[in-house]
Amino acid sequence: MILMRRREDVMPVCELRHATTEDTDSVYALICELLKNELDYQAFRDGFAANLLDPNVHYRLALRNGEVVGMISLHMQFHLHHANWIGEIQELVVLPPMRGQKIGSQLLAWAEEEARQAGAELTELSTNIKRRDAHRFYLREGYKQSHFRFTKAL
């Protein structure tokens, strides 16, 4: 799970702001970079717009010199098996040339503090088994590997 950090423990390295529908193209590009694949743009656009209206879904963008260079999504959910709120980080991506500059750490610290303020007992996330750099990043950030995730295409 997580060893909680305070937001002020991570020095700001970029500007963070909430995402809006005007950011659809930038967020789409980041998600395609994360997946190394292009998604159906119209389905993405519609889903992103719907998520922006959901009070339990939070998107934060990282900007350098006014350009979007990273993003994180935080989904607040009440888990029955915890009898408490959990902050699930579903996406965290930083453009490859910007990695290693603490942008991911700043985004993660924001999500952790946002979840903490909303009353969550922890944050959790899943990452593809192939993303070894991401695994090392999350371990450095205080996360512990505690579960296995199984998927099945439908």
Curated annotation (Swiss-Prot):
EC number: 2.3.1.280
Miscellaneous note of the record: Reaction proceeds via an ordered, sequential kinetic mechanism with AcCoA binding first followed by aminoalkylphosphonate.
One Pfam family this sequence matches: Acetyltransf_1
Keywords: Acyltransferase, Transferase
Subunit structure and binding partners: Homodimer.
Presence of keyword Acyltransferase: yes
Ranges annotated as spanning the membrane: none
Function field: Aminoalkylphosphonate N-acetyltransferase which is able to acetylate a range of aminoalkylphosphonic acids, including (S)-1-aminoethylphosphonate ((S)-1AEP) and 2-aminoethylphosphonate, using acetyl-CoA as acetyl donor. Its physiological role in S.typhimurium is unclear. However, by acetylating (S)-1AEP, PhnO would protect against the deleterious effects of (S)-1AEP, a structural analog of D-alanine that has antibacterial properties.
Matches recorded under InterPro entries: Acyl_CoA_acyltransferase (IPR016181), Bact_Acetyltransf (IPR050832), GNAT_dom (IPR000182)
Name of the protein in question: Aminoalkylphosphonate N-acetyltransferase
Ranges of residues in domain N-acetyltransferase: 14-154
CDD domains: NAT_SF
NCBIfam families: PRK10146.1
MF (Gene Ontology): acyltransferase activity, transferring groups other than amino-acyl groups
UniProt cross-references to Gene3D superfamilies, sorted A to Z: 3.40.630.30
Domain of life: Bacteria
Lineage, top ranks: Bacteria, Pseudomonadati, Pseudomonadota, Gammaproteobacteria, Enterobacterales
Reactions listed under catalytic activity: aminomethylphosphonate + acetyl-CoA = 2-N-acetamidomethylphosphonate + CoA; (S)-1-aminoethylphosphonate + acetyl-CoA = [(1S)-1-acetamidoethyl]phosphonate + CoA
